[in-house]
């Protein structure tokens, strides 16, 4: 299993480098997230937003042995890929009992490949209904700004927290992000569905 997953990661990373993503009407979560591998260029050129190399996938835990086994397989797969892809990872369970798998890598392409690989493993193991969101961290030199992929909506949306304690966000900057890349990837147009995720641990 570990060898298969690592080979899948290598093939996926190669395919992202060649294709560059950019599917505007993706049929799957994989295609949707893959589109970020080219869309991020628009964030850099238009808004000076750069990837920090940090991303995460958020999963609702299930109190069954199969879920723990799946988590162990994902950790083995990521451990095996650390040297080849120059990435690190950690897992945490937050106060709401959600599992976070946090990835740190040198390039956004490796972030995308790792998140896709984890998501597909979760789906293959029968826990697709537990997938909540993937989060990609960007920064303009001042504050963190996030792109969130919601697995229930099958779309991205921006999130720019300003004050975590007061639950304040910068809607103006979020709209700028949407304007910059709405044509580059599947984007949620309904602002009421831009659900905040506070205290993102990336």
List each model region and its residues:
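Conserved short hydrophobic interaction patches
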Residues: 77, 118-125
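Charge-rich, low-complexity segments
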Residues: 2-67, 168-202
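Extended, folded cores of ATP/NTP-driven motor/assembly subunits in large transport
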Residues: 52-58, 104, 108, 131
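Helix-rich interaction surfaces within compact, conserved domain-sized segments
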Residues: 123-196
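Extracellular-facing segments of soluble proteins and assemblies that are Gly/Ser/Thr-biased and enriched
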Residues: 89-117
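Short, flexible loop/turn elements at secondary-structure junctions
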Residues: 63, 105-107, 153
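Short, solvent-exposed secondary-structure capping/transition elements
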Residues: 86-87, 109-114, 123-131
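A glycine-rich, hydrophobic loop/mini-helix early in the fold
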Residues: 42-98
């Amino acid at each position: 299993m570990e060898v298969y997953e690592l080979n899948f990661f290598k093939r996926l990373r190669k395919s992202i480098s060649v294709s560059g993503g950019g599917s505007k009407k993706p049929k799957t979560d994989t295609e949707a997230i893959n589109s970020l591998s080219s869309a991020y260029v628009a964030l850099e050129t238009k808004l000076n937003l750069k990837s920090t190399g940090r991303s995460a996938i958020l999963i609702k835990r299930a109190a069954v042995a199969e879920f723990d086994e799946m988590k162990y397989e994902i950790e083995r797969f990521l451990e095996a890929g650390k040297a080849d892809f120059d990435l690190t990872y950690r897992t945490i369970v937050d106060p709401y009992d959600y599992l976070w798998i946090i990835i740190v890598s040198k390039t956004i392409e490796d972030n995308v490949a790792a998140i896709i690989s984890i998501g597909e493993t979760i789906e293959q193991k029968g826990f697709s209904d537990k997938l909540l969101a993937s989060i990609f961290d960007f920064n303009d030199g001042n504050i963190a700004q996030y792109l969130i992929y919601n697995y229930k909506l099958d779309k991205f949306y921006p999130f720019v927290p300003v004050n975590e304690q007061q639950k304040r966000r910068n809607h103006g900057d979020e709209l700028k992000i949407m304007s910059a890349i709405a044509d580059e990837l599947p984007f949620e147009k309904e602002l009421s569905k831009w659900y905040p995720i506070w205290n993102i641990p990336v």
